[in-house]
Amino acid sequence: MSDYNYKPTLWTRADALKVHEDDPTTTQPVIDIAFPVMSEEVFIWDTMPLRDFDGEIISVNGWCIIFTLTADRNTDNPQFQDENGNYDITRDWEDRHGRARICYWYSRTGKDWIFGGRVMAEGVAPTTREWAGTPILLNDRGDIDLYYTCVTPGATIAKVRGKIVTSDQSVSLEGFQQVTSLFSADGTIYQTEEQNAFWNFRDPSPFIDRNDGKLYMLFEGNVAGPRGSHEITQAEMGNVPPGYEDVGGAKYQAGCVGLAVAKDLSGSEWQILPPLITAVGVNDQTERPHFVFQDGKYYLFTISHKYTFADNLTGPDGVYGFVSDKLTGPYTPMNSSGLVLGNPSSQPFQTYSHYVMPNGLVTSFIDSVPWKGKDYRIGGTEAPTVKILLKGDRSFIVDSFDYGYIPAMKDITLK
């Protein structure tokens, strides 16, 4: 389709050494153990607000809509009971990924979400797992393209089209009956399952670049090559101080933020392009990448875990970001290190899967909050929304809001 000549920006080990856990300007407030839950029937985690190709969060006829990864809470299933017959919520929560389904919720207020049900009926998806992506409102007729990840067998970026229908009382979805596969990892630019059984290839986030009018997509990947074959050169190291040259097993970390371009705005045919960001020797996961376009800059956000950092590096679960004046870079790590918003060390697993919206609001879900010493409370529900301020290559957390507060930025009246 097109020729692109750019080199990925390297997130270096020297950059990651600058991560400062518990910096008050980049740390999410502590969540109270008495948090409310959206539903006693289902867990939710990755949250995908309905948006347009510019990234603006959309309501339809006054209804806010979010999509979530969802799994039933199996409170009465013997498989998730302990030896005394009590419900083991931890076992149920940790099992959720294998039975993930995409569901939707709606609200008049941007909170107090009402459960709408599954987006795709049972049997529509070609794989056993429905993993995260992006719902895009295409027009004022209510057409939606849900870009998502088909997982097990394999991992394929796909989309499915449907329509939103509203009344004064509720929101329903129609269609979503034919899944179209778009592309998978190629083994040349992006690592495949054959190269690494622990490979990552998921989380499509399409957008139209205002500078050239083309449709692109971010996604999570790993740099191609057999697992453990990546070399940590001086370029990946960066300017590390004396005593920090030991990389341990960092050759196993090869995360990247991938890019693809569509043949046209229909989004039916795609060309895989080189990554925008690589994290070889730094981190193995760069999940749910997405853009915020502000002040003529490209703010690229991704989420990652403490446990996926390479040896002799660390950082909290949370949001990491990079900024550039051009789509293809080069990118500068936000706040020198990349860390934009992390969990406090006192509650390292309280939230995850953050999504930064163009209005600065950041949504996430509650994973687990410490309770009574070594015990903890499982969430599976929306976390409090926070707000960050972006100023050049720096960010600051400036406000916090109610649980699951995801207001629309623009309302579309259907014709």
From Swiss-Prot:
Keywords: Carbohydrate metabolism, Glycosyltransferase, Secreted, Transferase
EC number: 2.4.1.10
Record's subcellular location: Secreted
GO molecular function: levansucrase activity
Phenotype of gene-disrupted mutants: Mutant loses extracellular levansucrase activity and loses the ability to form the typical levan-containing, domed colony type on solid medium. Produces normal amounts of amylovoran. Disruption of the gene causes delayed development of necrotic virulence symptoms.
Function comment: Catalyzes the synthesis of levan, a fructose polymer, by transferring the fructosyl moiety from sucrose to a growing acceptor molecule.
Binding residues for sucrose: 45-46, 132, 202-203
InterPro entries: Glyco_hydro_68 (IPR003469), Glyco_hydro_beta-prop_sf (IPR023296)
Protein name in the entry: Levansucrase
Catalytic residues identified in the record: 46 (nucleophile), 287 (proton donor/acceptor)
Reactions accelerated catalytically: [6)-beta-D-fructofuranosyl-(2->](n) alpha-D-glucopyranoside + sucrose = [6)-beta-D-fructofuranosyl-(2->](n+1) alpha-D-glucopyranoside + D-glucose
GO CC terms of this entry: extracellular region
Entry superkingdom: Bacteria
Similarity field: Belongs to the glycosyl hydrolase 68 family.
UniProt site positions, description: Transition state stabilizer: 203
Record gene name: lsc
Xref: Pfam families: Glyco_hydro_68
GO biological process, one term: carbohydrate utilization
